Design a protein with these regions (language model features):
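PRPP-associated nucleotide enzymes
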Residues: 1-95
Length: 95
């Protein structure tokens, strides 16, 4: 497992955390749903998190041929990352 947090400062991480709401017991009792809608509503933070994904790739010398993203959140972040890396995006849908 690669640890990524150490390459980002605490202030950056905390500013992103503040953009993610926690909704307890949704969709069922005992689940803590993480709502990323506030992050998506901000070009500043959406760009920052995408840049962080690029930094992680570069830091680990990852040179993917394409980004594969699962349905839902993968469809949001995958194409943004692929575009910044200059590669294609492959969407994967749930059965």
């Amino acid at each position: 497992m690669v640890h990524h947090m150490s390459i980002f400062d605490n202030q950056t991480i905390e500013s992103l955390r503040q953009q993610i709401r926690t909704i307890p017991n949704f969709p069922i009792e005992g689940i803590m749903f993480r709502d990323i809608t506030p992050l998506l509503n901000s070009g500043k933070y959406l760009n920052k998190v995408t840049d962080m994904f690029v930094t992680i790739c570069n830091h680990n010398n990852w040179v993917p041929d394409a980004i594969v993203g699962p349905e839902a959140r993968g469809f949001i972040f995958g194409p943004l990352l692929a575009a910044k890396l200059g590669i294609g995006f492959i969407p994967i849908r749930k059965p």
